[in-house]
Amino acid sequence: MKSQHQVVLSLGSNQGQRLETIIQCIDVLHLEVGTVLKISPVYESPAWGFESTPFYNCALVLHTNASPTQVLNKILKIEKRLGRVRTGTVGYAARSIDIDIIAYDEIVLDTEKLQLPHPLMQDRNFVLLPFRDLQLDWMHPIFKKSVPELIAETTDNSICQAVATIPAPLSSIPLEKFNYIAFEGNIG
């Protein structure tokens, strides 16, 4: 059994200070869910499925020892803390932050609360383009296609424009300045 799992999340915001909210969200995810390793560029894209102001979207990959359900529960709490209000009405709405689990390793899961991989990822450029930018060796476990293949086949023709970059939290540690790193503890 793996101790660390690779999780791809999609973040979106179309209310308030969109970029600042996404940056704050990434910091909280890094502290509370798992180690954020890579972050895609931030894209601006039109609202999908409803009329509203444009979204800022990005994808990130993190490593965690939490289960898919634990990750979901943590991100729902983070969304609420960052101002997300769920009305319970059917359909899409503007939001300060939206965090979706796109992939968890290459697991296929279908429960009432969580479906993996995200069941609409292949239909959304605002998910596919940032996911591609993570440059992961990932294959959709149901469609047996890579992210570039999914992009080539999507029917979504919405324009997504890269507008910003956000450094990953670990990028501020200058590892190249160290000759070695020692880890304390038992080996074996």
Could you tell me what each predicted segment is?
Residues Q4, P174-Y180:
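A short, charged/proline- and glycine-enriched loop
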Residues S13, I99, G185:
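Short acidic donor-binding/metal-coordinating loop in glycosyltransferase active sites
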Residues K2-L11, Q15-S96, D105-E106:
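Nucleotide and nucleotide-moiety/phosphate-recognizing core
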Residues S10, V127, A182:
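Conserved beta-strand segments that form the floor/walls of ligand-binding pockets within enzyme
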Residues G49-P54, L72, K77-L175:
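Flexible, gly/pro- and Lys/Arg-enriched active-site loops
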Residues I181-G188:
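Glycine-rich phosphate-binding P-loop
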